[in-house]
Structures are given as C-alpha cells and as structure tokens.
C-alpha cells in the first residue's frame, strides 16, 4: 500500500519492556496484555481530523533494542511527533532515552516545532526508581512535555495522545472526526486553537 502524504506519523521510542506496545494497544484497541512480547516494529493506524479533512494517525511502535539503528533513523526522519517512553520502575530506561532524543535533534535539526512527549509509564507500580520531579527536570532540559501513564490501569493513555496533538503547531490535528467534543475539550481547543480528542 503506498504511503499517504496526509498521514500524521507518531513514533514511539523506549527501552524494551517499558510498555510502549501496551500504551499503543491500549489507545488504539482498548486492550492490555500482561505478557511481554518484544517488538521489532509495528504500525497502527487510526482516522483523525487534520487541517479540516480526514487523514490517518499512523503510530509506529519501535523496537526496544538498539539492534536496528537504520530503522531508528528512518522512523525519525519520517516522524511528525515523538513519544519517548520509560518505566518509572527503571532509571536505566530513562537514561537510555537520551541518545534517542539527541538523534531526533540531529536528524530533525531544531525540535522547537516538533511535538515530543516524555512519558513515565507504569506509574501504578509502587517500586519507583524515577520520581516525577526527576522526569520533569529531564523534560524541561529537553524542552518537551511530560506525562505519567499506566497502560495497565488505562491512566492518561488517551490524554497522552491528545496532549501530543495539542502540541502540534504546524497544522491542525484532532482525534475527533465527527465534530463532537466535550465542553472541557472545546475550551482547550479554543485555548490552543489546534486539537480536540473524542
């Protein structure tokens, strides 16, 4: 199938086992699996509103290993927005995002207009190695947004993708294609002037 030029491409990066696939599957299909199945690369699609017409939100769930640097570079070069996922139970998983962030900057040049979300997943777990303040400091250093999520508990999953689209300033994108929005979403839409989520 030829790639559509009006696809809005979101790329999800992070170490193996941090819950990248779980976040994507929870968002796209509303499901959660307890077993860990390593991903090489999967792509999921969902219809969204983009510049007042219908287009496809294409979410690329990347491998957690560093065995495929060419695939990483290709995903970054084609990506419009990025989700950098770590597990709050693993400081190493946060540290492993630094070279990926630097690669995004290297390939994209300025990331000033590129939506990037730093995501602390598994916030339902009690054995934390990364505290909220520490992750917020990294996000501030990288000049990106930060959010904690739990794919297992379905906490902040929809909000993560809404916020990512809200950060988009180059064009108007929305997960809503039928025009129905809550009053809270309408207010946020007026404030940002860009996105709303259904």
UniProtKB/Swiss-Prot annotation:
A lipid is attached at residue 195 (S-geranylgeranyl cysteine). GO terms for molecular function: GTP binding; GTPase activity. InterPro entries: P-loop_NTPase, Small_GTP-bd, Small_GTPase, Small_GTPase_Ras-type. GTP binds at residues 17-22, 33-39, 61-65, 121-125, 151-152. GO terms for biological process: signal transduction. It holds the Pfam family Ras. The modification Cysteine methyl ester is found at residue 195. It is found in: Cell membrane. Keywords: Cell membrane, GTP-binding, Lipoprotein, Membrane, Methylation, Nucleotide-binding, Prenylation. Residues 196-198 form a propeptide. A motif (Effector region) lies at residues 36-44. It is a lipid-anchor. The keyword Nucleotide-binding applies. This is GTP-binding protein Di-Ras1. Displays low GTPase activity and exists predominantly in the GTP-bound form. Belongs to the small GTPase superfamily. Di-Ras family. GO terms for cellular component: plasma membrane. The keyword Glycoprotein does not apply.
């Amino acid at each position: 199938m030829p790639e559509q030029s009006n696809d809005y491409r979101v790329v999800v990066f992070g170490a193996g086992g941090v819950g990248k696939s779980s976040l994507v599957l929870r968002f796209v299909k509303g499901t959660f699996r307890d077993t860990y199945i390593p991903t090489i690369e999967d792509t999921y699609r969902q219809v969204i509103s983009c510049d007042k017409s219908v287009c496809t939100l294409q979410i690329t769930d990347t491998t957690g290993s560093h065995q495929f640097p060419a695939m990483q570079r290709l995903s970054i070069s084609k990506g419009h927005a990025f989700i950098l996922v770590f597990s709050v139970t693993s400081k190493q998983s946060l540290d492993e995002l630094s070279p990926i962030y630097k690669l995004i900057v290297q390939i994209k040049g300025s990331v000033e207009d590129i939506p990037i979300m730093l995501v602390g997943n598994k916030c339902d777990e009690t054995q934390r190695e990364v505290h909220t303040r520490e992750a917020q400091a990294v996000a501030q250093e990288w000049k990106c947004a930060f959010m904690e999520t739990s794919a297992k508990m379905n906490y902040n999953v929809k909000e993560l993708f809404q916020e990512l689209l809200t950060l988009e300033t180059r064009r108007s994108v929305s997960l809503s294609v039928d025009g129905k929005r809550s009053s809270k979403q309408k207010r946020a839409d007026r404030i940002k002037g860009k996105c709303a989520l259904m």
